[in-house]
């Protein structure tokens, strides 16, 4: 029996990591302020290249290893960044040079795997996962620190979750992205999947039959002034407390509000050749995981599924999921609950990041076929979503979105069949379609050749982009046009 597969397109063209896969080690100097002078890296790295003459790229500074999130303090205007192993750094000037001063360490907050950070006024919120059960289990954890001049940051616990099982894969995404509601009343928190595509991940039998649970694959909404909450691994209790905002999202590693206060999230999909979604996230909606990703049905939900890359071109024989036999016949895979409706992803109209695998198995370009996809080229890992909320850019970019792609086709066996491109900055020109009650996006590459970009912030008409590196990372300043007239685009998919 053939595997069911459908591309959920909303229209024909007429007119968005796995996170890092090891828990961090403790810092050796937890309570001691550390400063590191910005320096030019001795490591051979790419220099980002603008793809337009009216966009400039310059090095802002080097940063500590394993940088993940970049922040701007809303009150002071100072830059801060966080690292995967628990550090929070304040960027200051010392003797004319930019300096990274460590102000918070793992010992201060107890988050072994620090992935999320956001400011709400002078309150810095941090989220991630703790280690439990001799590194076989975990809890989600959200804390906040008051960051004010000359005062030691003091921590308040917002929530801890009930403990649940880790797994032995790179797919345990954890609690990782934060966003503050425009009215300042809530913190939105993403908890990614603990599986690749909904399969059993029991950590070699420690957690029998464990798949995803009530605390994963969701975006939560928590009152900004909440303290010492205990979130249970119980879907009914979480819904009764109104903590769950949206469900069925594999891993929304970044979220952002647009100028109209719509919440969007960018998501990375599984090792199957699903496109990478960008969702317009609305309260009470379900976005398909684990049954649909990138507009493509997950074949493992069907009892007759027998994974064979020779028969199913959406399966890559060299993928982690195939090599580890996580794609498997799975007759006990959960069924779609009766009456459950899925909300589709934002539809990409191109001209960039819109390559996809068609029903025939061939790689196609939406520009040539007239098909919109949900939303970005497969395996590209969209991160660092931002919008021009202050409407300071030129007419061409005013109020628009921007997103990074962390993966590059030349270095990814999964992405390379689709494109050699990636690790770039995309301009997102979004428009609402009333008929489908969804958004369409025109996507254009504007800066190329980042090293390992993970996050971005906007200040004035400049984007600041931070890169993750095991030895030395970087922050780049991308200056966008603010008062120039709209320019004609020439060509496509260059760089």
Model-derived regions, located:
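Extracellular/periplasmic ectodomains of large secreted or surface enzymes and adhesion receptors
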Residues: 477-495
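Short, glycine/acidic-rich beta->alpha junctions
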Residues: 62, 71, 109, 169-172, ...
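Bacterial N-terminal signal peptides that target proteins for export
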Residues: 1-9
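C-terminal target-recognition/interaction regions appended to catalytic cores
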Residues: 400, 444, 452-458, 462-465
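Bacterial N-terminal signal peptides
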Residues: 10-18
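Bacterial Sec-dependent signal peptides at the C-terminal "C-region" and cleavage site
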Residues: 17-28
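Beta-propeller domain segments
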Residues: 29-50, 193-243, 250-251, 255-442, ...
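Acidic, Gly/Ser/Thr-rich repeat motifs that build Ca2+-stabilized beta-propeller blades
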Residues: 26-197, 378-435, 462-480
